[in-house]
Amino acid sequence: MATIHVDVVSAEASIFSGEAKFVALPGEMGELGIYPRHTPLITRIKPGAVRVERADNGEEEFVFVAGGILEVQPDRVTVLADTAIRGHDLDEAKAEEAKKAAEEAMKNAKSDIDFAKAQGEFAAMAAQIAALRKFRKK
């Protein structure tokens, strides 16, 4: 069976590297599904869950990404994430707290720049919570 090599990296570390049967993630224009021998592609990714179906045991790996860039080659997928957290390391309480703080920051923003920063943080935390709940269902 054909496989595709997947690397998920953040500024801090390599989060996942291995062979996969399938990768799904939130692209800028919608959900993307990538199989081996996919057409080359570069696109931005939105905050959300990256799902990797491992080739060795068929298990699914989940990684939350807070946006970034996706590069697809026929034999390789590279996710360059702004922030990436393994699914089992996500903390819903911290994410809820950060989401509330971002909501307050949006209410108290003194400039458009401050509002945009808070809005981005709010969207990232909402996506992280959604990814965590999706991960828990598996």
UniProtKB/Swiss-Prot annotation:
One of its GO terms (molecular function) is proton-transporting ATP synthase activity, rotational mechanism. It is found in: Cell inner membrane. The keyword Cell membrane applies. It comes from the Bacteria. Transmembrane segments: none annotated. The keyword Transport applies. SUPFAM superfamilies: Epsilon subunit of F1F0-ATP synthase C-terminal domain, Epsilon subunit of F1F0-ATP synthase N-terminal domain. GO terms for cellular component: plasma membrane; proton-transporting ATP synthase complex. It is a peripheral membrane protein. Gene3D superfamilies: ATP synthase delta/epsilon subunit, C-terminal domain, F0F1 ATP synthase delta/epsilon subunit, N-terminal. Keywords: ATP synthesis, Cell inner membrane, Cell membrane, CF(1), Hydrogen ion transport, Ion transport, Membrane, Transport. Pfam families: ATP-synt_DE (PF00401), ATP-synt_DE_N (PF02823). Produces ATP from ADP in the presence of a proton gradient across the membrane. Belongs to the ATPase epsilon chain family. F-type ATPases have 2 components, CF(1) - the catalytic core - and CF(0) - the membrane proton channel. CF(1) has five subunits: alpha(3), beta(3), gamma(1), delta(1), epsilon(1). CF(0) has three main subunits: a, b and c. This is ATP synthase epsilon chain. The lineage of its organism: Bacteria, Pseudomonadati, Pseudomonadota, Betaproteobacteria, Burkholderiales. The gene is atpC.
